[in-house]
Amino acid sequence: ERQQRLLEIPGVMLSDIEIRSYTLENAASHLIGYVQSVTAEDLENHAGEGYSANSVIGRSGVEGLFEKELKGKDGCEISIVDENGITKEVVASIIKEDGKDIQLTIDSELQKNLYERFKDDRGCSVAMNPYTGEVLALVSTPAFDNNDFITGMSSEQWTALNEDENKPLYNRFRQIWCPGSTFKPIIAGIGLKTGTVNPSEDFGNEGLSWQKDSSWGSYQVTTLHAYEPVTMENAIIYSDNIYFAKAALKIGADNLKNSLDEIGFNQKIPFEITMSESQYSNSDKIETEIQLADSGYGQGQILVNPLHLASIYTAFVNDGNIIKPYLRYQDNAKGEVWISEAFKAEDVSEVLKGVKGVINNPEGTGYTAHRDDVVLAGKTGTAEIKATKEDTSGTEIGWFSIFTTDQTAEKPVLIVSMVENVKGIGGSGYVVQKDTEVLNDYFERK
């Protein structure tokens, strides 16, 4: 009807054109990226590469990453035609080449489901097959509709996107964040590997606050639950900050730095999309005893990329080996080891006891996600972002890492989700609830 009205206007003609269409829209906009018409600068930077004033070029995400393969080549033909337009002779021609199809490992339903659950939050989610390394989802929220970049957006739309305080253009899964208690299983693995922590040792019930000695002044490490015995398994289940502060002190600054470097800190993740490098300090060392203690429970100056965190967690179900994540689909995928013996195989079972308890023990902080049909393990985390220990105006980052523990599981999966500003809305429990809903759909989907 609209087309008919337009055609009734003298001089108006309609024509069909082919455009790029992003069917996942907002759900994968940071991952897929978008193409745009080339600029004069593009033509200068890519001179001799087959671009013309009518070309489009990948700007970000997969579109930018695989631009050379997706682009293809334009064709043309010079021919002689008669007065009726019939070709009499082809003088010269260049056959066009279509761009290659790029197939990803992404599970589109899981990608959409994670987006729908978290779309109103400032956060991100990563999903992997923990045994093969296939990345099943990469979600950043809030997001934008990348189709708007194809058809062109108004200056008002562009201004609104850029000035939105929730930063929908900001790709959160590429950044580094304070991991909070999701870091504790890593500290447990390092303590066991270095021989500095005995998993059955009772560290003693210190109540809900503790400091090593008076040299710490007024600084106290606090925790939420008192329990006994204070062993590694229970400390993971109850998410005990004091236990892991003590564990970090036992490990020592040099041991911790070296061990974290060995599992990918301060180096690029071997992945198609460039991610920010995880760090254990703003400098090249852990400066103080308090910083070391805080590092033990994922605070201090620890910052971790979500995909890196997910990759480290693969070691807990692969005999201590960290599996390399990848995005481009491969037939008959088998896990490629990125870092071998990140943790000792015999120690992994000790860590698994704790992370299984987080999900399967009614006292565990992630028990909401418990299922009777699939054995799951995981860790919650609530990272405090504030200027000082006494600061009450800071924010909290909520985390949840959860994964299948059996390689024969029908639908193996590992999910890491992070949400900013969970203070006052349930902390990490807010993230646990949403990921539980996602997993329910995932496991029940045929």
Stretches found by the model and what they are:
Residues 1-124, 139, 144-171, 176:
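Extracytoplasmic/periplasmic proteins that interact with beta-lactams or build/remodel peptidoglycan
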Residues 36-44, 194-197, 318-323, 445-446:
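Short helix-capping/linker segments at secondary-structure and domain boundaries
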Residues 59, 309, 427-439:
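Short, charged, low-complexity patches
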Residues 82-84, 89-91, 131-182, 186-419, ...:
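Beta-lactam-recognizing serine transpeptidase/beta-lactamase-like catalytic domain environment
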Residues 125-130:
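Short hydrophobic alpha-helical segments used for membrane anchoring or interfacial signaling
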Residues 335-337, 432-446:
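Short, gly/Ser/Thr-rich active-site loops of penicillin-recognizing serine hydrolases
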